[in-house]
Amino acid sequence: MNPILKVNRVCKAYQQGNHRVEVLEHLSMSADAGEKIAILGPSGCGKSTLLSLLAGLDKPDVGTVEIDGQDLAKMSEDARTRTRSERLGIVFQQYHLMRNLTAIENVGLPLEILGKPDYADRARMALKAVGLSHRVAHFPSEMSGGECQRVAIARALVARPSVVLADEPSGNLDQKTGEEVMELLFSLCDEHNTTLILVTHNEELTKRCDRALILKNGALQKVKG
């Protein structure tokens, strides 16, 4: 079985003044359908850079990032946008909702981009799945941080993507709300056999993943699985 996500010898560097800083060096990894992988590492080690590459928001200097066998860097911008809407779900620490859109409009955006005529109905179902049927017409400013993160999870999963990329999704929430949000994310990924790539510092969440990898010196090292 071919991996759903494959990273092959990726390098990424940034210019800082007169210096070129290597962030990722010949990094490789893969993930199978339904697999949950925790990515660990200290602040500034390149975890966010890696997620940006996985999401097709940035391109590697060297190497390839493939989703369902397709190289993201070789796609047109329109094709990458469509891939992000259809095959990738993204949940950030900051939920990044459109403040001028209601919950149902935010959740329906990926489907609207894909031209799905039933996007409103599917967005409504996704909000029901995260326990927010009563918030469909509310704006982000009218909801709590935990509710907004639930909306972000609903948006990430509404198109039934192959992979969800999550960057410390409970990091800005209190412990109880964070635990509820993560339980929801794990449960929905299990239900739909969705691959989860989770950047986290939480040891308990790491234990729930099939594998744990630590990003060190620009490369990934296995610490579990």
Predicted regions and their residues:
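Exposed loop/turn and edge beta-strand positions of beta-sandwich/beta-sheet ligand-binding modules
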Residues: 1
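ABC family nucleotide-binding domain
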Residues: 4-216
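Short hydrophobic/aromatic patches at helix-to-coil boundaries
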Residues: 114, 223-225
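Conserved switch/coupling elements of ABC/ABC-like ATPase nucleotide-binding domains
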Residues: 217-223
